[in-house]
Regions:
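Short helix-loop junctions at transmembrane helix boundaries
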Residues: 396, 405-426, 488-499, 862-910, ...
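Membrane transport/envelope proteins' first extracytoplasmic loop
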Residues: 1-354, 490-501, 514, 584-592, ...
């Protein structure tokens, strides 16, 4: 082989080596960095894609939940029509038979406009009497001497919705006409028990003809799903009721019940006096509804009630048909809850999104710092900014795009069915941010040559005019956002105002900018103090902290925003829990409450003794409650018609209860009356004046002078000695609290029990032995009744995830900030070890160096989080998020946002602990390595 051929082959190999793919070479050179970037992009893309899907999912589940648990009397759509007009009796009878009504029913269900969908199984049709008809049979029960009244209906598919308990299903024998005199019927078990009906019983129904219609009971049935729409839209079909008369004077009650006829017996009802009418009841099917269809659903329901869709229904059911429903009310209530929750959730999303963006930019800054020398060399050898940027873009895209796509797939798989495009937009935004920001930020650093080793620290940095203008702009936005949030709350005209939702982020950003400007001042003061002390470690650590690069400012920003978001989210969850606790306490007044109907039943002394002996009982406060006590008026002979509530208490035990619950605490001696208390059953002296505590409204009404009070507990004079806005015994706006020992007619009507781990079984047993009218309410059970709806639990889950993600990104920001300067600190330790620095001193040096920024971020985050909550609390109301379900959902008018100490302190302490841990680990790792590689000649670090 000739030398020439050898030289040509060598040149070809050299050219091949020079043209080696950049991306493949970089990935092989630094696989760990590429994997770390990919993992960060994966997690961030997953969060960005999962958030909109989670919101869609819990909003849709909340809508379905509201429609399913709603009373069918509000959610069912009922189509009614007048009975067939007078004319040929055969035609009238045919119009109400099952064949005709069933055909209309099927056409109505098939013609419902989307997204109104029917649950065909729970939907029903038939004919019913709209006016109850009195039954004159002597054997029927008459509690007040009044005849019971019965309604008659022919519900479709009765055997599919009920179980036959006795007898046989009612049928028709031959063809029933309008002149029929005998039909069969069934009744439910509850109706049979209440009215004394049994198989074979007959009821004579008056008609417009000469002979009555005889209805014979052939079967006793039990509903399969009593709470479903088939039985619960008209509860009279399954459950009879005692109804009061509407006449003046004391109410008299009579029974009202329903008899169930077979569908083809409907013509017989046309001759009765009960004003029969055909009906078609459409139970909504919520299984496929989504939150995006709420507006369309409301529009279609309105059209069905009075619009073009109603005309279509009239073409099927008759020109006078009408459709009635309260489904639009249910949708309005759902919209109100969603409008109250969505802006609060958006606050968490904006906060975490801002922190994630800052952390991604910090990652790019770390990569730029680590590759500064390499790219500077490329630039010095003729590399163009466009060429370098293109290679960095390709290198970043190879890692970021697949990671973002994988995060999107994981979010789609992990979160339930929802819209796809918001998730795609979120994951794409993360990929674009990484692919654009990282190469662009790295390339812009090499626009012009920079002097090697020039100082770039926070101590000597002088803010430019552009930075000052930008900071002032952010300040104006923050002030505007906070002012808007305080003035009109989180809701913005039914939508979400992102400027308002970004208020916590903007406050954190302003705080970061202020702290970055103030950072040199405490360092200078500390340096002067340390300079006078013995030893060089402290002074050297502060000097190193002062030389910290301005690139540490993004870390401070990320930490403050993350800590603010975590504090806000934790305070939201704590506020929800506090509101539910408060509502539970208002419902019971203590850990347990024992009372009769209307708090008016006197309790035997034995009940009080048995309750005191029950397990877990610490104290019992007997209370006498009387509602509707008239207040005196300044006009002679005129009294307050509404009255107030009189609460007779034992001052000692009741004052202790008020302090324990935090509701209207007061000193017990304020209720002590002068002189001897009247004996039981005796009239008090006319000159005796009882001190009372009153609500503000009642106190204003009574004034400061003694006033006469007339009540069932006695007639006496009272003087207001103090006011309390609330009291444990009653949850009313107006009340008077008086010493029960001073009342003439003393009796205990309510027991307020305090104690830990109360024995509910023993308390209920004691109450039952005292009488069946006494009931026991437990505070724990009232609290547990506030079960989260899917929308509430979804919003709380997002806030919990926001807290966790905020903490994770905050810790990652600390880690990235320390890793960015890790090579410089490692070289410093190597040089100082040659001067006699010990391992222990090295750990102290790195720990003290990391502490200023960590403490600044921790203390700043704690203060900023607290101040943010204080600033935004007037505009954030958590009552919808906390109390949209449960027995006391209207117990609180408002549930303000309150700072949660743990949510403020724990993340801040975590930042300090992580900074100290990373510094200790780095000192330990540097101590194990040799110093040769760190002491290379010409190294400028």
């Amino acid at each position: 082989m000739s030398p020439r051929s050898d030289s040509g082959r060598s040149a070809g190999v050299a050219r091949a080596a020079a043209c080696a793919p950049w991306v493949r070479t970089r990935l092989r050179t630094a696989p760990a960095a590429a994997c770390a970037l990919g993992l960060l992009v994966l997690v961030t893309a997953f969060l960005a894609a999962a958030f909109p899907r989670a919101v869609d999912t819990y909003e849709s589940k909340g809508l379905r939940h509201d429609l399913v648990v709603e009373d069918p009397r509000r959610s069912v759509l009922e189509l009614t029509a007048p009975p067939p007009a007078l004319g040929v009796e055969a035609a009238r009878a045919a119009a109400v038979r099952e064949t005709a009504l069933g055909a209309v029913h099927r056409k109505v269900l098939a013609g419902l406009p989307e997204p109104v969908r029917a649950d065909a199984f729970q939907s029903s049709y038939g004919i019913r009497t709209t006016e109850p008809i009195a039954a004159g049979e002597k054997w029927l029960p008459r509690p007040y001497g009044l005849d019971p009244k019965l309604t008659y209906a022919t519900p479709s598919a009765l055997p599919a919705h009920a179980t036959l308990r006795d007898g046989a299903w009612p049928t028709v024998h031959g063809e029933v006409t309008t002149t029929a005199t005998k039909v069969e019927a069934a009744v439910t078990e509850e109706t049979a028990k209440a009215l004394g009906l049994k198989v074979g019983s007959t009821i004579a129904v008056p008609t417009r003809g000469e002979e009555p219609l005889t209805v014979r009971i052939t079967g006793i049935v039990a509903p399969k799903l009593p709470g479903a729409a088939y039985w619960s839209f008209e509860r009279l079909l399954r459950t009879p009721a005692l109804v009061p008369t509407s006449s003046k004077g004391p109410p008299l009650y009579y029974w009202i019940a329903a008899l169930l006829l077979p569908p083809d017996a409907a013509p017989a009802l046309l001759s009765t006096t009960g004003a029969p009418e055909p009906y078609w009841r459409i139970a909504p099917d919520a299984s496929r509804l989504t939150a995006l269809e709420v507006d369309r659903l409301r529009s279609r329901v309105a059209s069905l009630e009075s619009g073009p869709e109603l005309l279509k229904l009239r073409a099927l059911a008759g020109p006078a048909a009408t459709l009635t429903t309260d489904l639009d009310v249910v949708l309005t209530r759902y919209d109100a809850l969603r409008s109250a929750i969505s802006p609060v959730v958006t606050v968490a999303a904006v906060g975490i999104g801002a922190v994630a963006a800052v952390v991604l930019l910090m990652t790019g800054g770390l990569f730029a710092a680590r590759r500064h020398s390499e790219l500077a060399l490329l630039r010095s050898r003729g590399g163009s900014l466009r060429g370098i940027g293109g290679r960095l873009l390709a290198e970043t895209a190879v890692t970021a795009v697949p990671a973002a796509a994988l995060g999107l797939l994981l979010a789609v798989a992990a979160v339930g069915p929802a819209r796809l495009w918001p998730a795609v937009v979120g994951a794409t935004a993360v990929a674009v941010l990484v692919c654009v920001a990282l190469p662009l930020g790295t390339t812009l650093l090499h626009r012009r040559p920079r002097l090697h080793g020039a100082r770039d620290d926070m101590m000597t940095a002088r803010p430019s005019r552009r930075r000052t203008v930008a900071e002032l702009t952010v300040l104006v936005l923050a002030v505007g956002a906070v002012a808007a949030l305080r003035r009109r709350g989180t809701a913005a005209g039914g939508g979400t105002d992102f400027l308002v939702s970004a208020a916590p982020v903007l406050v954190g950003l302003i705080a970061a900018l202020v702290l970055a400007r103030l950072y040199p001042l405490p360092l200078r003061l500390a340096s002067r103090t340390v300079a006078r002390l013995r030893g060089a470690i402290g002074f050297l650590a502060l000097a190193r902290a002062g030389r910290a690069s301005v690139s540490g400012a993004p870390a401070l920003l990320a930490l403050l925003v993350a800590l603010t978001t975590a504090a806000f989210g934790g305070s939201v969850l704590a506020g929800v829990a506090d509101a539910r606790d408060d509502a539970a306490v208002r419902a019971t007044g203590a850990d347990a409450r024992i009372s009769g109907e209307g708090d008016a039943m006197p309790m035997p002394d034995r009940l009080v003794r048995d309750v005191r002996k029950a397990g877990g009982v610490r104290d019992v406060a007997p209370v006498q409650i009387e509602y509707g006590v008239p207040l005196p008026s300044d006009d002679p002979g005129v009294e307050d018609a509404k009255g107030t509530t009189l609460v007779g208490v034992d001052p000692g035990t009741y004052a202790k209860l008020a302090r324990a619950t935090g509701i209207g605490s007061f000193p017990a001696d304020r209720l002590k009356a002068g002189g001897a208390a009247p004996r039981k059953g005796t009239l008090p002296s006319k000159d005796r004046v009882l001190p009372v505590l009153a609500s503000p409204a009642v106190a204003e009404r009574l004034g400061e002078r003694p006033r006469d009070i007339r009540s069932q507990a006695g007639d006496f004079k009272v003087r207001v000695v103090g006011t309390v806005t609330r009291t444990p015994a009653v949850d009313t706006a107006g009340f008077l609290i008086v010493d029960a020992a001073s009342l003439t007619h003393r009796q205990t009507t309510t027991l307020l029990v305090t104690g830990a781990s109360l024995d509910a079984k023993a308390l209920r047993g004691a109450a039952h032995r005292a009488g069946s009218t006494f009931a026991v309410q437990l505070r724990a059970e009232e609290r547990a009744a506030f079960v989260d709806t899917p929308m509430q639990s979804g919003a709380e889950g997002i806030y919990a995830a926001a807290i966790a993600a905020g903490a994770g990104y905050a810790l990652l920001a600390v880690l990235l900030s320390l890793l960015q300067t890790a090579p410089e600190r490692t070289a410093l330790l190597a040089r100082l070890r040659t001067m006699g620095l010990t391992l222990r001193q090295g750990r102290r040096l790195l720990g003290l160096e990391a502490m200023p920024q960590a403490l600044l971020a921790a203390v700043g985050g704690l203060l900023v989080g607290w101040s943010t909550i204080v600033l935004l609390a007037p505009g954030v109301d958590l009552v919808q998020l906390a109390l949209s379900s449960g027995p006391g959902s209207d117990a609180l008018d408002t549930a303000p946002l309150r700072a949660d100490p743990w949510s403020l302190a724990l993340p801040a302490l975590g930042v300090v602990a992580l900074a100290a841990t990373v510094a200790a680990v780095q000192a330990w790792w540097a101590g194990r390595r040799g110093s040769i590689t760190e002491l290379r000649a010409g190294d400028t670090r």
